[in-house]
């Protein structure tokens, strides 16, 4: 009960945050539509339609809470973030703290971008502030227009359920990490004995989890024992019991721990580094690669490569598979951009990924199989024997890719395609 209450609280907190980006954005769209890039204008108009048509009382509450908190939250965020980061930006770019405050107020009241994104998208750089309206946010995509497109297209192939995803891929000969077994409310599903029987490193994660939350790594130490990243030792039956207990809150699945291709291991920090490759259906309903980044775990994280959990990401030249400078999430401008991995010292910038053509082909083939979705963010691992699907995300976090690529998607190819499909399906999602 406590777990479900916490999940519900976090869900509404994220929804309130998303709604808070909408007030000024929608007001400016109504007053000054020509100030928005054409694609961003179309996307924001669709967002406006969804914004003012809450599906239930909970969404009305989210709007009311966001409206009450938004002005105070904007002011408080500006003061706190400028105190925290203003000195670094002033020293590196010559933008005074007063100017930074003014920039953040302007962004919040003209584009809906809340103060943290001023630093995430580095809009303090000369000439960058004017691009604010072209950046797409979670509120305007993941929590609204992406869902509208999914409903309009009748999207139903399993991207949210990792267990069903693996089965779906296996039936279509798509390389993916196999599921050894799953546990639902304490019940084991799949072929597994009481002693577990897998003399290999294991990886546990929620069937419907996101962001790497709840994932656990257990390395096989021999004689039927497994060791966690934190040093806990469990026998095989004890590990089964642990998964049973975890599954009482949400279903879990167990996979063998995959390891990167030898040409990438010095960038992985002993976790599994994956390529987040964003694909979208074009005007002819054929998948097209929009952009890609390589995610890499750093510091003490040897379990997941999630950027929001502190990992770094490097942009990938989609034609040749060449890496650019890597970056953190951007919430701390002191960290900036780096050419080498912080722990291993291995070169990132200019490096070419192995098996890149095969990875691109797999992403396009996968989207063809999941063709009822307009946009998918694929996590693909480059293993010794080839690229392998880890998961697909129907609600891909746009900010995860916009920052490393230094691209505002509202004025890019993705924006064009989203606008095209929103226009084409308007007669459906307006019903």
Label each PLM-derived region with a short phrase:
Residues 1-65:
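Intrinsically disordered, low-structural-confidence terminal and linker regions
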Residues 198-200, 230-329:
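Phosphate-binding site of ATP-dependent enzymes
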